[in-house]
């Protein structure tokens, strides 16, 4: 199959959605020929910054594929990591398109509005040279471990199902 100039193979085509393209499959094929380094830095609360280095093709023929790859990557990072400031480092054309996409009227208006409400501040997309990419500032912090109250866990595994109930840390 081919999408935006990138050839990729799928083992199975979904019968109910034959036009579906799994991003992971397309991404792997896209990255094989991508050589121009770029970075995405996502800033969130307390000055924490996640930096992700990757590559794009950087040619006019692959401009749409480059944009789609970076647009999907930014959306993934906003939903998985969270943040209110995204720096696109190393490709002004993509940064400028993303600045238009993440507006109240843009193609990513839902994400823009959601992030604004979540962080109580406007989502910013910055255009920076690669050498001015913010430095990573990650802080490990423990999660979970709450033993008081009632909890139920459910695992719908491939071959079996498991259920666990805990009250104040006791099964």
Language model segments and positions:
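Nucleotide/phosphate-binding catalytic cleft detector across ATP-hydrolyzing
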Residues: 1-151
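Gly/Thr-rich phosphate-binding beta-strand-loop-beta motif of the actin/hexokinase/Hsp70
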Residues: 139-169
